[in-house]
Amino acid sequence: MSTATAIGSIACGSSIAAPFVSTKVKSLKYRIPDLAPKPPLGWNSFDSYGVYLHFDAAMANLEAFHQKLQPHGYEYFVIDLGWYGEYSLVEGTLFPNEKHATDLSLDKYGLLEPSHTYFSKGIKPIIDRAHELGLKIGVHMMRGIPRKAVKLNTPIKGTDYKAADIANIKSICEWCHHNYGINTSKPGAQEYYNSAYKKLADWEIDFVKVDDLIPYPDEIVMIANAIENSGRKMLLSLSPGGTTNPQDLPYYRRSNMVRITADIWDRRDDLDKAFNQWRIFQGMGSPGFWPDLDMIPFGNLQTMQPAEYDGKKRDFRLSGFGSKRICQLTKEEMKTFITIRSLAASPIMMGGDLPTLDDYSLSLITNEDMLGCNQNGQTGVLVYEKDNIEIWMAKKTDEPMQGWLGIFNRNESPKTVTLNAEDLKLGITPNTRNVFENPVPDFKMKDIWNKDEFIFHAGGKSFNIPDYGVIFLAFEKAN
């Protein structure tokens, strides 16, 4: 059942409040590791469709996912924000005429329903097709309760409470004004979240990305509890990442993924964002919980945002970054981008349009060695830095003399560097920090991107690295 009353008349913007943080949470459970024993692999609609994914595009991407990504271990197909938005459209098109929908589709309990604008057939056919193909399906949710539900004061399912009883009307997301936060101290608050996530469980959703949540520990706990109360295993992904703080790891570990960067796009500066956050969170991933460096903006992006409508430039900015385009990173920068995700054991969520994906992008995100490093599940650590050359290492689980190295050139010009075994931290005696075997053994090396193999001797080797490029190596001790 859909209720159609606009939320635009509710005041917004000026009353955004700081996170509501309780001091009452004293013990925190951890998520079940078997839900994400390795970094999740999948596709998310945001980079290519913003918050305007529609039914036909979803189905086309799902079929392309099955053909192009699933054979390589990719599993999660995720519909991002907007699937419940009743958008105003440019006449005769599916292009949006507003950044975020003014109206939302809700049921009588104030719970989200698929949009009649973009999902007139519902999302059940997409869910069923994903499961038929052996894939898992995810949706995006915002923290809190729809402001429309509060205005209508809808009942909280299974209780005598109503939406207005639990809303924290001073807590509004800065970039999407659909919801109020929840006052977690109020009776009915947990019950509301229970009902929202039980509905997703009944739809057979497998993955939930919850946005505007990371700065709100109490609501992280409530949503994690709601998922556990739903009776269905659903992977929980926390977003966005601009305020992620290692001190809050006990809360984040109620989830399976936590964004550690702000939005990442096809810009060289965003490579620096990823490096900087990786440094902070290095070594913190483990089975069931993975720091997330955001989606992979390869291929066609922002497809619902052409530069002009009917020859007239837009007078408002839509969601995401920029207009319709092909990824603007160079081929070398793309190698660096995906190598970071591989060595960091970050979840890999492809963002570009899959039906139109170019062969080069596909070759990077399906490379067996890259995925082997990522799925090894050891979050890489920084072992060397000098003159803007950084070396990151991820060792193979239970095999200290095997692993992967990324030699990154973070300079604005190409560099030639000569590195020895000590620089690369190769040949360290197991269970010691910096005690090298004597003599240091030779290592077999595979240059993953340049498709070369060689023996690395302790004395060293020179590497030529493009600006913002990488040498990505798999290594193992030579016999």
Positions of PLM-derived features:
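Aromatic-lined carbohydrate-binding/catalytic grooves of carbohydrate-active enzymes
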Residues: 65-129, 133-201, 205-207, 216-217
